[in-house]
């Protein structure tokens, strides 16, 4: 099985940050990415389990993968075009 998290185009370390900081940083980072590029987000705030998927839905980006069974949480999103 391929590890989807192994080769993102960009990585955002949001460990230790609390809502709303992680999603604000994701928004700023994604804004500077090209369509089709991927972003790995590493976080430990439980609010990200709802905020990151919600951000992807609202902004129409693809939530490629998420791993929220244990800490740290990992999310891989692809910027829409």
Swiss-Prot record:
Pfam families: TusA
Active site: 19
Subunit structure: Interacts with IscS.
Organism: Escherichia coli (strain SMS-3-5 / SECEC)
Role description: Sulfur carrier protein involved in sulfur trafficking in the cell. Part of a sulfur-relay system required for 2-thiolation during synthesis of 2-thiouridine of the modified wobble base 5-methylaminomethyl-2-thiouridine (mnm(5)s(2)U) in tRNA. Interacts with IscS and stimulates its cysteine desulfurase activity. Accepts an activated sulfur from IscS, which is then transferred to TusD, and thus determines the direction of sulfur flow from IscS to 2-thiouridine formation. Also appears to be involved in sulfur transfer for the biosynthesis of molybdopterin.
Family listed: Belongs to the sulfur carrier protein TusA family.
Keywords from the UniProt entry: Cytoplasm, tRNA processing
The protein's name in its UniProt record: Sulfur carrier protein TusA
Record HAMAP family: Thiourid_synth_A
Any Gene Ontology biological process: tRNA wobble position uridine thiolation
Pathway(s) it belongs to: tRNA modification
One GO cellular component term noted in the UniProt record for this chain: cytoplasm
Localization in the cell: Cytoplasm
Single GO molecular function: sulfur carrier activity
Ribonucleoprotein listed as a keyword: no
Source domain of life: Bacteria
Chief location category: cytoplasm
